[in-house]
């Protein structure tokens, strides 16, 4: 403001020093030195500019001068007009012209100056221009030191900010200043903004430096978080950082985003450690045995989801076999978990416990399997049966062994087609051969020989017992079994022939005849039911075949009772059973060599009997036939046609071809009907 110094004329004629604050149309706003008078507007005709500072002081006697003096102690000093009366050395005697009375005073040379030649100011003496200030720069523009360089560049007398008009005021005594202000105003405001930003950063840096100095003496921790986990560490909208800052005792948390480094400062180590637990996210993996991966995951991921929920981890990932990012052991699969260090520790505890539990359960299961295997091996060697015990020493073809084998096949096999139980054997022997390994071969031969040589009465009694039990069975065959085949005990007689060639092979036919006799002795209702259920296919060696029926039809077309077969009612077949038999051609039991031998021998024996022998035993044979066939009974071998006629001659079966071959190759001894040579 020194450049805009003016002299304001007072009421007593003296000029007092003042400073221009604003320029108006016809006046100036002036502020007096030392504020001895309040700020006020002064007209142009009472204001003048001070003289140049480099003016020469040449004063002589009689010159008019201006003396720097004051009228009283309350007023400041001002320039008064006077005249030099006398000079003596450095002292001058002056006479004030403003006063009415003559007033003389001795003053020194420093208080004198030549009369100011400047006239009062006019409207064009001072130039004023304004610059609008943005809102963000108003506070900065209020400081006059911010315009120091701008003031010097434009040549302004004064630059200040007017808060009422929010403008920057530029006052100058030169018109060129206005042009320069218009050119440099934008640049000046931009520079102020840049300076303001730099100043604010410097202030923040200063504050940070002070805080750092204070925190350096306190507790702090520093850790690094991976770049891909930085989002989890910060949290949604910085929630994790805010939660860490709310921990009591935490003073500051700093984050370097470039390096992913967190710095936590606090008043205590516990507070700093607790805040670190909210921000430190890591990734770790746990090796899981490959055979337990499915059980660790659980059905629909239920087990692994429960582990994740209880531990607090963020996510879990199972590394595939094609990925080799993590080191893995043989037979192990890495489970990768992401979360805080605390949650990773929790999931390790849960997973290790669960794996130990699964291993223990697997070990118990393996022990159970070993025990079951040992039991299975022991059971294959010896299987005790409740129905057998004291009767083990009886023959193979007894009633008890037959019933036992049928019951055993029921308990182990299903009811479907072609299913055979574990007691089924395709050889010549029976189940008793497998279940009684302790018996010697000689004992078997003795038992078979005894059975084949047993009396006719004893055999008939046994077969009658068998025939009484057979009709009650649920199966389709004559025997009481549930499947298609007959009793397995029938095969023991075949095997006896093969194992003991010295015995009489024709004794097998007696069993068949005794079977037929036993069937005749049974009730008529049971017999008709069983005959209706029979099929044309031979079930076992004990059943009569179609060829046997044809052989008998050659000898006598009318049965022993004198009734023709055509007079009988046509047999009614079950359609469902007939459809059932069509698809069971593949389920036939295998035909063995013993079957061919027994069948061929029986047929050849009947055909090659001498006429004398047949005539001799005709009475006995007729007696047996009468006992076997009742008046209401149908033909034994093979069903009749619907019209009651006999079955027409069928093509030769495989048994007949076998019989023909045996006749040509070997000679057959003559035998009587009852098998006694």
UniProtKB/Swiss-Prot annotation:
The keyword Cytoplasm applies. Belongs to the FMR1 family. This is RNA-binding protein FXR1. Changing residue 525 to A: Decreased phosphorylation by GSK3B. In early embryogenesis, highest expression in somites and central nervous system. Also expressed in spinal cord, surrounding mesenchymal tissue and undifferentiated gonad. In mid-embryogenesis, most prominent in gonad and muscle tissue. Also expressed in liver, retina, telencephalon and mesencephalon. In late embryogenesis, restricted to skeletal muscle and proliferative active layers of brain. After birth, highly expressed in postmeiotic spermatids (at protein level). Expressed in neurons of the developing hippocampus. Residues 404-414 have a biased composition (Low complexity). Pfam families: Agenet, FXMRP1_C_core, FXR_C1, FXR_C3, KH_1, KH_9, Tudor_FRX1. There is a cross-link at residue 56 (Glycyl lysine isopeptide (Lys-Gly) (interchain with G-Cter in SUMO2)). mRNA-binding protein that acts as a regulator of mRNAs translation and/or stability, and which is required for various processes, such as neurogenesis, muscle development and spermatogenesis. Specifically binds to AU-rich elements (AREs) in the 3'-UTR of target mRNAs. Promotes formation of some phase-separated membraneless compartment by undergoing liquid-liquid phase separation upon binding to AREs-containing mRNAs, leading to assemble mRNAs into cytoplasmic ribonucleoprotein granules that concentrate mRNAs with associated regulatory factors. Phosphorylation at Ser-449 by PAK1 promotes its relocalization to stress granules and activity. Phosphorylated by MAPK1/ERK2, promoting subsequent phosphorylation by GSK3B. Phosphorylated by GSK3B, promoting ubiquitination and degradation by the proteasome. Ubiquitinated by the SCF(FBXO4) complex, leading to its degradation by the proteasome: ubiquitination by the SCF(FBXO4) complex takes place following phosphorylation by GSK3B. Ubiquitinated and degraded in a GSK3B-dependent manner in during both scaling and sleep deprivation. Ubiquitinated via 'Lys-63'-linked ubiquitin, leading to its degradation: interaction with CEP63 inhibits 'Lys-63'-linked ubiquitination. It comes from Mus musculus (Mouse). Residues 353-379 are annotated as: CC2 domain. The modification N-acetylalanine is found at residue 2. The gene is Fxr1. Residues 609-632, 646-666 have a biased composition (Basic and acidic residues). GO terms for cellular component: axon; costamere; cytoplasm; cytoplasmic ribonucleoprotein granule; cytoplasmic stress granule; cytosol; dendrite; dendritic spine. Changing residue 492 to A: Decreased phosphorylation by GSK3B. It is found in: Cytoplasm, Cytoplasmic ribonucleoprotein granule; Cytoplasm, Stress granule; Cytoplasm; Cell projection, Dendrite.
């Amino acid at each position: 403001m020194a450049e805009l110094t003016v002299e304001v004329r007072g009421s007593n004629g003296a000029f007092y020093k003042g400073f221009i604050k604003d320029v108006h149309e016809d006046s100036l706003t002036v502020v007096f030195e030392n504020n001895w008078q309040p700020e006020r507007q002064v007209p142009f005709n009472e204001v003048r500019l001070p003289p140049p500072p480099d003016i020469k002081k040449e004063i002589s006697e009689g010159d008019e001068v201006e003396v720097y003096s004051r009228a009283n102690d309350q007023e400041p000093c001002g320039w008064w007009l006077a005249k030099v009366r006398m000079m003596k050395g450095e002292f001058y005697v002056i006479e004030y012209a403003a006063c009415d009375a003559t007033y003389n005073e001795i003053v020194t040379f420093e208080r004198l100056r030549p009369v100011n030649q400047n006239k009062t100011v006019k409207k064009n003496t001072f130039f004023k221009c304004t610059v609008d200030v943005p809102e963000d720069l108003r506070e900065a523009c209020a400081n006059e030191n911010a315009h120091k360089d701008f003031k010097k560049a434009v040549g302004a007398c004064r630059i200040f900010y007017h808060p009422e008009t929010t403008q920057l005021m530029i006052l100058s005594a030169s018109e060129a200043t206005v042009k320069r202000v218009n050119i440099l105003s934008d640049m000046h405001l931009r520079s102020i903004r840049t300076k303001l930003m730099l100043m604010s950063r410097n202030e923040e840096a200063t504050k940070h430096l002070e805080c750092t100095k204070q925190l350096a003496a306190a507790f702090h921790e520093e850790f690094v978080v991976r770049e891909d986990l930085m989002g989890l560490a910060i949290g949604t909208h910085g929630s994790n950082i805010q939660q860490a800052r709310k921990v009591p005792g935490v003073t500051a948390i700093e984050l370097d985003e470039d390096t992913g480094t967190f710095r936590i400062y606090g008043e205590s180590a516990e507070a700093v450690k607790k805040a670190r637990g909210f921000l430190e996210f890591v990734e770790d993996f746990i090796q899981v045995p490959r055979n337990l991966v499915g059980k660790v995951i659980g059905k629909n991921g239920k087990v692994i989801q429960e582990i994740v929920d209880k531990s607090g981890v963020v996510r879990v990932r199972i590394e595939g076999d094609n990925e080799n990012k993590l080191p893995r052991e043989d037979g192990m699969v890495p489970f990768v978990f992401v979360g805080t260090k605390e949650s990773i520790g929790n999931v390790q505890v849960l997973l290790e416990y669960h794996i130990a539990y699964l291993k223990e359960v697997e070990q118990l299961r393996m022990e159970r399997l070993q025990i079951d295997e040992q039991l299975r091996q022991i059971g294959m060697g010896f299987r005790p049966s409740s129905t057998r015990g004291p009767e083990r020493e009886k023959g193979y073809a007894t009633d008890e062994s037959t019933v036992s084998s049928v019951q055993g096949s029921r308990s182990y096999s299903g009811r479907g087609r072609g299913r055979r139980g574990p007691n089924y054997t395709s050889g010549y022997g029976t189940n008793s051969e497998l279940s009684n390994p302790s018996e010697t071969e000689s004992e078997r031969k003795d038992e078979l020989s005894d059975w084949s040589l047993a009396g006719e009465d004893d055999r008939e009694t046994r077969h009658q017992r068998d025939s009484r039990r057979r009709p009650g069975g649920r199966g389709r065959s004559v025997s009481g079994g549930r499947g298609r085949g007959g009793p397995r005990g029938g095969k023991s007689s075949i095997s006896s022939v093969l194992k003991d060639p010295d015995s009489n092979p024709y004794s097998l036919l007696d069993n068949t005849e005794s079977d037929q006799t036993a069937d005749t002795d049974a009730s008529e209702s049971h017999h008709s039911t069983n005959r209706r259920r029979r099929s044309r296919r031979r079930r076992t060696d004990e059943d009569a075949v179609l060829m046997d029926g044809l052989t008998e039809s050659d000898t006598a077309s009318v049965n022993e009772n004198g009734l023709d077969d055509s007079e009988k009612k046509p047999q009614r077949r079950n359609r469902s059973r007939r459809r059932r038999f069509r698809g069971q051609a593949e389920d036939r039991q295998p035909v063995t060599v013993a079957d061919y031998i027994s069948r061929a021998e029986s047929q050849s024996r009947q055909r090659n009997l001498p006429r004398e022998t047949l005539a001799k035993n005709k009475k006995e044979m007729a007696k047996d036939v009468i006992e076997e066939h009742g008046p209401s009974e149908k033909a034994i071998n093979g069903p009749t046609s619907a019209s009651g006629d006999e079955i027409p001659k069928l093509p030769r079966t495989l048994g007949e071809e076998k019989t023909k071959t045996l006749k040509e190759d070997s000679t057959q001894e003559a035998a009587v009907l009852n098998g006694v040579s």
